[in-house]
Curated annotation (Swiss-Prot):
The gene is thrB. This is Homoserine kinase. The lineage of its organism: Bacteria, Pseudomonadati, Pseudomonadota, Betaproteobacteria, Nitrosomonadales. Coiled coil: none annotated. Keywords: Amino-acid biosynthesis, ATP-binding, Kinase, Nucleotide-binding, Threonine biosynthesis, Transferase. It catalyses: L-homoserine + ATP = O-phospho-L-homoserine + ADP + H(+). HAMAP family: Homoser_kinase_2 (MF_00301). InterPro entries: Aminoglycoside_PTrfase (IPR002575), Homoserine_kinase_II (IPR005280), Kinase-like_dom_sf (IPR011009), Pseudomonas-type_ThrB (IPR050249).
Amino acid sequence: MSVFTIVTHEQLSAWLRNYSIGKLVNLQGISSGIENTNYFVTTSHGKYVLTLFEKLTSAELPYYLNLMAYLARHGLPCPSPVADLANKFLGELNGKPASIVTCLPGKSQESPTATHCAEVGELLANMHLSGLSYPEKMENLRGPRWWKAAAQEVMPFLSEDEAAILGEELRFQSSHRTESLPRGVIHADLFRDNVLFKDGAMGGVIDFYFACNDVLLYDLAITANDWCLNENAELDPERTLSLLEAYHRTRPLLEIERDAWPVMLRAGALRFWLSRLQDYHLPRAGELTHVKDPAHFMRILQSHAAARSKLAEVWI
């Protein structure tokens, strides 16, 4: 979440006349994150989050907004999009598609314990099961086809060693097939900053704008790559097992998923290494932006590649 498009108090006050959520009291830009423009919005009725979408189009956005509304109706602790007076979730503000959603309580947990990882595992499994009946479909816009295109864009900026690592990983991933793995709706970005805790309990999960239909295990791998790492970019066995076991109790994992686990961990690291390389070397203009270190995910990828047999041992 960043601020690429400026919204003034007067502009938002006028825009909010299309909604029944009271008068604007306060507007505050959110600098964390990297994809969209986000503001905390306080009105006379409560607190909300305003998002102006910088990349996603009006044709793509109903999938994400309807998904949040669907999951909230099914008991998942996620933001609920607010409909305007015309009963639409999506509007336009300052030339960008825009929506406003409820603001969930809590803060992210930067130093998660095994207990936190277990809560996240259960949450993710419940989301996957609930999503099986979600009728809309969206391909993964950050999937293998995008990996190849993004790699071509960033390759001129890489050192010889970095380019070799990237090329080898693309070859490795292209040699593995995922068609037989369970699929459904995935969050695809369940990092620590997208899960909120309040007074030791989970407050909810946010930022569904990378959600798509893809391999469920890939979602679990992305989550493990952020929640379960130690300072050496290796999976911590205790936290990883807590995540996997809690997930498995709700959606039992298959033997074929165990076999694919090391591949999916590397795929998750590759995807975020590439997106961070893009953001670092090809930045977009913005007033409050947050660019993250791409080398972090290169280290994770290297660690996973060097420990494939060890990764397979950490399983339920």
